[in-house]
Amino acid sequence: MDMNNVNIEEIVKQVLSGMTGNAPAGNTIPKKARVAMMTEKKHFELQEYDLPEVGDDDILVKVEGCGVCGTDAHEYKNDPFGLIPVVLGHEGTGEIVKMGKNVKVDTAGKPVKVGDKIVTCMIFKDDPEITMFDLNKKNVGGADVYGLLPDDDVKFNGWFADYIFIRGGKFGSTFFNVSDLDLDSRILIEPCAVLVHAVERAKTTGILKFNSRVVVQGCGPIGLICIAVLHTMGVHNICAVDGNEKRLEFAKRMGANTTVNFMNFKGIEALTEAVKEAQGGHLADFAFQCTGNPHAHSNIYKFIRNGGGLCELGFFINGGDATINPHFDLCSKEINLVGSWVYNLRDYATTFDFLKRAKAIGLPMSELITHKFPLEEINEALETNLAMTGLKIAIVNK
């Protein structure tokens, strides 16, 4: 009887603590915690700081995991954004351990409480009242994200840390309650949103349909997720193009029905014929260019039929100039070209549904995460990403 009373008492304490915005029993918040601070190119060091005081509009999140993005790898290698010193990590997720009294719902209006799992999206400092129904792309273009913020007194500005501090009010943070998704799915939300947005951009051309012949060039994480998004939407005539046979095999598991290894062909003419043969003697109705290689962009026009479409989404940094012949590649073929850059708030909501659908039909999404490292091994994690020895690399806290 005494044991039952203790259990009931503990349950009541946890319920009450969730209502009052404090950490539940057994989840004591320390006074100090660690961040992985990038102090110079190709070097993180773990630094300990006092956790900030949580204000009425703020949220303190215990980090559970964070994917390593190509953007993180580029910043780690060359600091192209000039952010050093910086706490990186923007593909993160974790559990709310404390929140201000004014925090009641997430950006979609879904109730939140201590113990819920969340992800962050964009930061709209210039327009903190923006909602997920404001789809003007110019608003998104000027947004920030946690994990690419300049260092300041808060310190806990990125997901490569023990905790992350989500600032409320006029700071313009957006976040979503994703407690109904498992950890691997939550880590994949941000990169999947990039592809959900790219497919939505492609649909604006009016060319991408259920029976479209589609080429996806590049079978890294972005290209593989692109194939999965297309497959879940009912596009089942997909040709994957890459130079890595293992990645091409994975592409088939994600929904590609044919593959072409460009390493087996000399010259763009031979490669084009191979792509055409893989699609029953036809050029593609639509193509997605998912690499950051300028030569790949130059070549992909050859794979597309007259009047077809192309979505370029591979260049998240300046990868150099690509050379095309505007007459032969674009004008005379009347190619419909769209660029795609990150995502908007609505794309995040769509991404949650995509991940549930992908899991339901058996797509191996979680297998995209090939390497998991603790925070203490973050330098090794970034080096693994640069070496391209896996697909998706993630930092997963104990």
Regions found by a protein language model. Name each.
Residues 106, 125-214:
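NAD(P)H dinucleotide-binding glycine-rich loop of Rossmann-like/cofactor-binding domains
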